[in-house]
Amino acid sequence: MKSLSFLNHEFEAFPSPELALTDPNGLLAIGGDLRPERLLTAYYNGIFPWFNADDPILWWSPDPRAIFMLGKIRISTSLCKYLKKQPWHFTINHAFTSVMAGCAEPRPKQNGTWITDEIQMAYRELHQNGHAHSIEVWEGEQLIGGLYGLAIGQVFCGESMFHRQTNASKAAIVVLQQHLIKRGFKLIDAQVMNPHLESLGAKAIKRTHFIELLTQFRDKKVHPDAWIPSEVFLEL
């Protein structure tokens, strides 16, 4: 039976994702906190927080789930030509806080942001502890795009991306894919499908299939230098 769980500030196990509501799709639990231990446990089990500034903490595990299988991100001929012309350079874990702030900037036709100060503080702590990571896109010394997310074994859980110049966020995800393949990752969890993700090659799969993949890869190791702050190169 589908049911909604209420969490308190005592650390406790999450309910099974299979108990998540169908309307709204994937809502599993309310409450708790954003301590690193709770967040890591959530992602380890295919659950993530998503809530507005005035809401309690909401925990989700939607069905279907959007994922990118590595090597399957779609790079159109026109995008490839465009990116080759840009004087951009790319880094890993050089400006995590600035990337989160960029992702939190208001979007067209969007009121506010779910990347609240509380969320930013929690994920900065995860970054300091070696769990959350960023890709940066630069033009000179100006940050023009990027993305951030969490690494759970061989799975990268993408959280958000942003751009201040056309196609900069697409460049970030292409760089991310290239980096993850080289370091032994298997897939990107993109959480909820939308037209932008679909245009890049994301697939919507059943939650049960996603949990199977997550269980298969979440305890496996990747290359030890995967997240050392460094410059990376776009290969087209």
Swiss-Prot record:
It is found in: Cytoplasm. Belongs to the L/F-transferase family. It comes from Shewanella sp. (strain W3-18-1). The lineage of its organism: Bacteria, Pseudomonadati, Pseudomonadota, Gammaproteobacteria, Alteromonadales. This is Leucyl/phenylalanyl-tRNA--protein transferase. GO terms for cellular component: cytoplasm. Its EC number is 2.3.2.6. Keywords: Acyltransferase, Cytoplasm, Transferase. It is an enzyme of class 2 (transferase). It holds the Pfam family Leu_Phe_trans.
